[in-house]
Amino acid sequence: MVIPVRQRCNSITRPGRKPMQTWTKRAVSAFVLMLLASCGEQAPESTLDGIYTAAQAERGEGLFTTHCQRCHSIQEFSGRMFSAVWAEVPASALYYRIASTMPMDQPGSLGNTEVTALMAHIFDANGMPAGSSPLEADLEWMNTIPMRQPGQ
């Protein structure tokens, strides 16, 4: 016995629905989902995309005074001096340098939140804008974020 095409197609969908209606609804739903997904925040591409918070930079300033100012001034980490060494270098390199070598009298003693706060302070001193999400100690992600100053 041969089943007419119309009956075969209707048996795939729920009873009472036409096959084209089901396909159209699915296609429209998929399109709307893609459209909504594209409306979300875009991933940051550099340190100019607000990868730290102002509160984090403020905390970093206090940590800099406590742990770093004995040997360093913030000018060493800002402007042309910073750019000459760190321009286009991934943020992960700065994280690693601070985490593994500072402070000089106790290298490696700073925790992740302290290191990222110090980085936020350095970014702030270089005019890199703050954002709404704190900088996290995610080295894989930081490895994709080049350090750039405004005007670069």
Give residue ranges: language-model regions.
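Electrostatic cytochrome c docking/interface patches
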Residues: 40-62, 106
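Flexible coil segments in periplasmic/lumen-exposed cytochrome c-class electron-transfer proteins
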Residues: 110-152
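C-terminal motif of bacterial Sec signal peptides marking the signal peptidase cleavage site
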Residues: 36-38
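Electron-transfer interface patches adjacent to heme c in soluble/periplasmic c-type cytochromes
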Residues: 77-96, 103-116, 134, 149-151
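Bacterial N-terminal signal peptides that target proteins for export
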Residues: 18-28
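The canonical Cys-X-X-Cys-His
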Residues: 60, 64-74, 118, 122
